[in-house]
């Protein structure tokens, strides 16, 4: 089942962030309507009970569309909600520990920002690596991010991570997503570009079309 799930890890990877004015479920529905193939719940300040309820409903929405639902940081919530997997940061549980909670069929991804972190993710058994920031980003995390890596840095990361797929993140917009696809990223992740859009469904659709443009259909 994990291989089948990984085969669907492609295209627009929409991240639902707690800083949006829209409700998480409204954003999930909009992203799916726009053609997102992967949705991540990144609700770091949500109480566990609230996150679980949102995850359960999000899983149901994603199943209808054939999309993947991943939970940020919380393999326990991901397992209880029957999500497709989890995305981990550098300071979260190691991939092996997350997989003990989730079981063998779930996807485990991890954020990376350097060659050393990519190598460590591969050695730890991650299923994919998130890499960035590719461009300057409007989204803020708890830890300071390294400087933008650019398309050249992304291309190097794709080569370094192989055979693991790479999810590019950081400042990616409709205008730049085709470059990201051509650099070899399996997915283009976005937070502010989608969550802050006046019409998130339309913006997601534009990004999905641009990702597969220029002969880069997947």
Regions found by a protein language model. Give the residues of each.
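Conserved N-terminal beta1-alpha1 strand-loop-helix module at the mouth
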Residues: 1-92, 100-128, 146-152, 156, ...
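Glycine/threonine-rich flexible loop motifs
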Residues: 139-143
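A short, polar/charged loop-to-alpha-helix boundary motif
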Residues: 93-95, 138
